[in-house]
Amino acid sequence: MALTVDVAGPAPWGFRISGGRDFHTPIIVTKVTERGKAEAADLRPGDIIVAINGQSAENMLHAEAQSKIRQSASPLRLQLDRSQTASPGQTNGEGSLEVLATRFQGSLRTHRDSQSSQRSACFSPVSLSPRPCSPFSTPPPTSPVALSKEDMIGCSFQSLTHSPGLAAAHHLTYPGHPTSQQAGHSSPSDSAVRVLLHSPGRPSSPRFSSLDLEEDSEVFKMLQENRQGRAAPRQSSSFRLLQEALEAEERGGTPAFVPSSLSSQASLPTSRALATPPKLHTCEKCSVNISNQAVRIQEGRYRHPGCYTCADCGLNLKMRGHFWVGNELYCEKHARQRYSMPGTLNSRA
């Protein structure tokens, strides 16, 4: 439907456009501001702009059409082509991408809700008319033995693993009611879960007395994870060696050598690591073992750095050297006092 709209000015006009020759689409009104000038002139989203102020907009670029609309004098005359039914992708303030995203999210939410409802129905306690996917199914109506409503007990997988007081099976045994095996009938859910009922007078045990599960079933995997989680933690090799050494020491034996992973002896053989430490030198002046730095005077003769002094004045000879007079060490000054001739001095500078 062709029509002409006059929008009273001045700019801004209160609407947005999209398309153009560079987009290979006609120029279309995409949004109209509420209570604006364009809305007052009955401009609607989805209108195709055919001409702007009498100039054809068929070959206009998008920027060119925007410029002509912004710089137009009042009133702005637009020739429109309005369809009878609004396009589903053109709504006020909502582009086609937004509409599609909203619909896609809604469909995802609906699909997720349906899956959760199916999952809850599959794992929910047994109702009066159980679904075929439930492993806890009652005998078919054609079976000669059928349990009454009072004899039905619902039990989900969660109650099977976390509620030891509850016991469920594909056929439940009660006093006065023969089982399906006694009646000669078998159910296709024999391979699902079979749990023997606990005695009413006996307290419930955390472990089931009899449990047959398929290895690829979810309940079997859940029980395996719980059993592995309760297992004792493994000891490392170093901790085990340390524990054995402490136990040997408590028994009065010789503790085994446990090298640290950071020590230099960790990579050495055991015989070398347990070897006796090297022999320490003995100071010839104070007759004490030298545990750190030693001054070598002659072969087999050592002194502490503090004991390497003049026998007369006590001056340290480390930076000066020593002179032998008999069997004593002297500095040069006191050694010359004991000899009139310097040539007789025995210098060890």
UniProtKB/Swiss-Prot annotation:
InterPro entries: PDLI1-4/Zasp-like_mid, PDZ, PDZ-LIM_domain, PDZ_sf, Znf_LIM. The keyword Thylakoid does not apply. Signal peptide: none annotated. One of its GO terms (cellular component) is cytoskeleton. It is found in: Cytoplasm; Cytoplasm, Cytoskeleton. PROSITE patterns: LIM_DOMAIN_1, LIM_DOMAIN_2, PDZ. Residues 74-147, 169-212 are annotated as: Disordered. Residues 281-341 form the LIM zinc-binding domain. Induction: Regulated by IGF-1. Keywords: Cytoplasm, Cytoskeleton, LIM domain, Metal-binding, Phosphoprotein, Zinc. The keyword Hydrolase does not apply. One of its GO terms (molecular function) is ubiquitin protein ligase binding. Gene3D superfamilies: 2.30.42.10, Cysteine Rich Protein (2.10.110.10). This is PDZ and LIM domain protein 2. It comes from Mus musculus (Mouse). The lineage of its organism: Eukaryota, Metazoa, Chordata, Craniata, Vertebrata.
